[in-house]
Amino acid sequence: MPTQIQNNFRVRKTFAKIAKIIDIPNLINIQKQSYEKFLQADIAADKREDLGLQGVFKSVFPIRDFNETSSLEFVSYHLERPKYDVDECHQRGMTYSAPIKVVVRLVVWDKDEETGAQSIRDVKEQEVYFGEIPLMTQNGTFIINGTERVVVSQLHRSPGAFFDHDKGKSHSSGKLLYNARIIPYRGSWIDFEFDHKDLLYVRIDRRRKLPATVLIRALGAVPDTAKKNPLEFKGSTEEILNYYYATETIYLHSAEEFEKSVELELLPGQRATRDIKAKTGELIVKKNRKFTRAAIKKLEAAKMKTLPIDADELFTKVSAYDVVEETNGVVLLECNEEVTQEKVDELLKHGIKEFKVLFIDNLNVGPYLRETLMLDKLETPEQSIMEIYRRLRPGDPPTPETAINLFTNLFFNPERYDLSKVGRLKLNFKFGLEEPLDGQILTKRDILEVIRYLIDLKNGKGTIDDIDHLGNRRVRAVGELLENQYRIGLVRMERAIKERMSLQEIETLMPHDLINAKPVTAVIKEFFGSSQLSQFMDQTNPLSEVTHKRRLSALGPGGLTRERAGFEVRDVHPTHYGRICPIETPEGPNIGLIASLSTYARVNEFGFVETPYRKVEAGVVTNDVAFYSALEEEKHTIAQANAETDKKGKFANALVSSRRGGEFVQARAEDVDLMDVSPKQLVSVAASLIPFLENDDANRALMGSNMQRQAVPLLRTAAPLVGTGIESIVARDSGVTCVARRDGIVESVDAGRIVVKADVPASLSDVTSEVDIYNLLKYQRSNQNTCLNQKPIISKGDRVMKGDVIADGPATETGELALGQNVVVAFMPWQGYNFEDSILISERILKDDVFTSIHIEEFECIARDTKLGKEEITRDIPNVGEEALKDLDESGIIRIGAEVKPGDVLVGKITPKGETQLSPEEKLLRAIFGEKAGDVRDSSLRVPPGVVGTVINAKVFSRKGVEKDERAKQIESMEEAKLLKDQNDEIKVLQDSAFGRIRGLVRTKEVQGKLVDDKGKILLKKGDILDDELLSTVPYKYWGEISVGDPLDSRLRDILRNLEETKEAVKLAFGEKIARIKKGDELPPGVIKMVKVYVAIKRKLAVGDKMAGRHGNKGVVSRILPEEDMPYLEDGRPVDIVLNPLGVPSRMNIGQILETHLGWAAKGTGEALQRYVEANWSSDAIKERLKVIYSDPAFGEFLDKLDDEEIKQLCLRSKRGIHVATPVFDGAQETEIHALLDEGQLPRSGQMVLFDGRTGEPFDQNVTVGVMYMLKLHHLVDEKIHARSIGPYSLVTQQPLGGKAQFGGQRLGEMEVWAMEAYGAAYTLQEFLTVKSDDVVGRTRMYEAIVKGDNVLESGLPESFNVLLKELQSLALDVELLESAPPERQRSFGGDFLGGGDGEERKTGTEA
């Protein structure tokens, strides 16, 4: 029976108090789902939704020609199988992509000249190749030109309407100027803004501003595009004013006596112009008093219909309509005209007793729009549209048709303007509209409502939008980014198609003649190759991969730029809670612009980030979970995940700490309607891997989560003793481990692959799917040159379940993330070697390879076809001794396993040299002794400085039609053998399974007819009863002829037929792969052969390497001390690392101390358990002890099922310490750490007596000792240090280049020169500034002097001086250099003055 305690079994004691409600969603879903939605590859063409690729095709097609006589329509598309699989693309430097084929239909119309009716003349349908589209791998990455890349999701401003003000900065008075902006997904922006005179203006696409009423009036000239209740709006002044202002009726009794109608909703805040009494004589409001709510109620009760009004008040009012004299139609009072005494008299004269005025009280309602109308001199919609045309196209003479056309195209044409579903959703939400979500263009009501809201803001109603609210920012994931690129490509292609349709004779053309997919593929290539959002994957370790795929960037096309982004955008916002991690963001210029999704967050169909909450009903917490976006969450009161509840889920306290509308409040239990799912939903994956995160300062937690991503995978991995319980999830979702696809039993295991026989119901006659072969990744190079290697962690015969980890990858151990090592640390100063965060380390760590990592470098050698002839890869290299070639094979490529150092030849290569003119003597010698190897030069690939390692692999790629060399053939045959082994294994398992099934069917059955082999030997007699023994005598090839009677016979034939078909399919698939290996490779033009050599470098921990814990506690190794000199414990065990205690208090990352104590307790408990097992082995007693330690009822039940051997195995696993999990914000309390220290028989203080390794004396005070998880970071001293010998110089300044990559020198800057001057080191300084730097002449003289043995320095003129001269001359300054005479000559002139007496010495030269 397989044991329960397999190698991939790991149990953690968890300190969590809060039960798990839902699992963390798959960590790379954001990438995979978005791309699946974009491609819709597995959905039938007729069932695809109009989004992603389908949506793009649908929106660009049909393409009509300019005369509308033909159109090209889109029917469907499908993806074919990719040419190369993922591994082949990696090796060959190809892009992992699939060809896309599109079915298009070309329809040619006949147009009736008289009626204009169209009839179809011809329809041609054809499948057209549409280029390749990159596919996403299983792990959410793309392989572009052989390297893995990730497309980062972009956070951008959501489409919709936004309201804001200028914070009083625009005008000197400090007045708030409000503005509104309608931002579409694509199309023209509309900005509305008030100026300091309170007039309302509009800008279209940030052009010159127009009065807003011009745009409002222009709307009257176009039909409304609303799908639901369209608005009848003709754009007249009356319509405009009555849309925005309420009206009152004025009753004229005489020239001095007026009344107005009572409009109850308009009264609050107004003052009474005189005492107002009811009919009963009761005083309702005194003169000059405001109408209060009580007064309005009294008015209502008294049923008063009118109120008296003073002349002063009446003569500020504005007419709402034209008042017309009925008999002859003369306008007595125009709309928007102020009422005056003259007008009143005129009205009374014509017998008009009542008219309507606008309600403008300058308190709650301002006259802004009315005053803007006064400014606007245009009177009809047509004039307004012409004015807009003039602003947008200055210099173009407008005609009514072109003007209306342009205006319609701006906002009401779906091809030019797209609000997107999100934009429509936001507008509906903001203004309470009911327009359907597919109404993705603006309607009249949208524009009018935006202006209404803006005027309300100005009047003091409503609030401005918070641009950083996550309801106003949305995520564009891969699918959407690619969709936009594809649209750009198709639009470019559309132009070309239109031109072709009109140029050529359409009847003779087929669709493929019109379509050229080059522009589309070019756009896609450019996006993946050079877009800011398509990034080289950070593959340092599994965590960095996962984080990279979950990253959100506010940068990139259509986003912000580093320089322009202010503090608000970068800051943490209340809506980030549970959606975006407040901790994980880079330090430096990108801080806050690049963020990470929180653990439970997901992106909804509109691109808004959602987070899950548990529903609370009547004060009882349920287990129903729903996802809410930032906007949906606004109205709810949300309790924290750690709010206390009783067994029934009721809140234990009357007041619960909650969040409402972004504020923290103490809410009543019955008011709470949602509750957090988990305490870790607040933070990202990297931050949730930090134990005791709650005890760390936020700045250090930020460094901690960033530095975990830089941890180098080590040769020996160890999962942290103190984890947070999320390690296994990260390892599983990152894709670096190998995960079982279905339940089954392990058939065979070796270092390179695992074969699992899956559980398939015995009833099936189909044998196709019974075997799963997992090929493991062996010693591959990652993007960051770390080593990717998988090793199996299960044994033959083990039972595996779907989702189990069956092989560990880099930086994982037993299926858990293992970025570093558990080491014993002591916090104490030691001889100043841990000053300023330095780290003192024991030599044991080097001896045991604790922090050793493997790095793989790839070197490439290319043989090209040059003008002078072909380059050749060969062992025969001119002027190279046999010693240097000892490791090359006959093809000139280094053998695998060779140890190489800088300067060694990896691949021998010779390049033809240009023909040189030979002297007669050389010609003679050549004629006598034959051709000498003088016409080629050595251009071999050599190991660069700083690389010492072992060759682990070599690959040879040859052009088609080029003879393969021995090495290439050898590699080919090895790969072929590997594939054949896979094929044979698969066939063997299939056969075993099929015959096993048949055996089960025919066992105990009676043979119906005798079975004879080819030679006539009887194998089975009629009437034999079949059993395993008898069946084993019959060779497999005769099993198909066994007859046991129907219906079993036909079932038997079915199984065998199915087996044969499956075998054929398997052979075919492997045959294709083998053929691909044998075929020549696709190489860039001009390349004949390419060799890649991989060198593995072992890097032990060295002085200068950077190390860190998980709490932002980083340092550099300062000294590696012999084990015997390290401080040691009472039992003689030395500690591994000594850290500086002064690094803790000021940094406030106390989590590291708690981790150290808990780690010590976990180690001590494991050791105590070991001692207990050795002292008194009794499985029952140990079970009880384990139940006490783990204190988990479910684990207790599991223990009861184990036998003695399994219990022993379980105890053996904990000899280095038991593994514990302390989840973030829900971790171990101090009392629990004390309890575990007691279990491990350790002092509760966590401090021990330490002895000095050099003297054996105890230190004065007890020292904090414990186990900390330390990481070795990617900043390795071996990769940073370098020394320049002969290297390149800059062209302009002639100074050596800088940096290791350029093999540069050390710069001696201004300050260093001052230091040399201060020491008075004149000669050294002269050397530094001339011959060692940029003095070209001096450099050559120096070389000559050294060769001749003169030790004299003759410096020339530094090139930088020449540069200075040229710069001065470029400023038109004539600079002349004077050469001073040598000292002796000066004396001979009697030393009168420098430069000689007769002016002969004054000559201009370039040498000073």
Swiss-Prot record:
GO MF entries: DNA binding; DNA-directed RNA polymerase activity; ribonucleoside binding
Signal peptide bounds: none
Enzyme class: transferase
Keyword Nucleotidyltransferase annotated: yes
Classification via CDD domains: RNA_pol_B_RPB2
Reaction equation(s) it catalyzes: RNA(n) + a ribonucleoside 5'-triphosphate = RNA(n+1) + diphosphate
Residue ranges, compositional bias (Basic and acidic residues): 1399-1408
The protein's Enzyme Commission number: 2.7.7.6
Disordered: annotated span: 1383-1408
InterPro entries, sorted: DNA-dir_RNA_pol_bsu_ext_1_sf (IPR042107), DNA-dir_RNA_pol_bsu_external_1 (IPR019462), DNA-dir_RNA_pol_su2 (IPR015712), DNA-dir_RNAP_su2_dom (IPR007120), DNA-dir_RNAP_su2_hyb_sf (IPR037033), RNA_pol_bsu_bac (IPR010243), RNA_pol_bsu_CS (IPR007121), RNA_pol_bsu_protrusion (IPR007644)
Name of a matching Pfam family: RNA_pol_Rpb2_1
Sorted UniProt keywords: DNA-directed RNA polymerase, Nucleotidyltransferase, Transcription, Transferase
PROSITE patterns, sorted: RNA_POL_BETA (PS01166)
GO cellular component terms, A-Z: DNA-directed RNA polymerase complex
GO terms under biological process: DNA-templated transcription
Subunit structure: The RNAP catalytic core consists of 2 alpha, 1 beta, 1 beta' and 1 omega subunit. When a sigma factor is associated with the core the holoenzyme is formed, which can initiate transcription.
PANTHER family to which the protein is assigned, alphabetical: DNA-DIRECTED RNA POLYMERASE I SUBUNIT 2
Protein's job: DNA-dependent RNA polymerase catalyzes the transcription of DNA into RNA using the four ribonucleoside triphosphates as substrates.
Family: Belongs to the RNA polymerase beta chain family.
Family annotation (NCBIfam families): PRK00405.1, rpoB
UniProt protein name: DNA-directed RNA polymerase subunit beta
Native source organism of the sequence: Myxococcus xanthus (strain DK1622)
Lineage: Bacteria, Pseudomonadati, Myxococcota, Myxococcia, Myxococcales
Gene that encodes it: rpoB
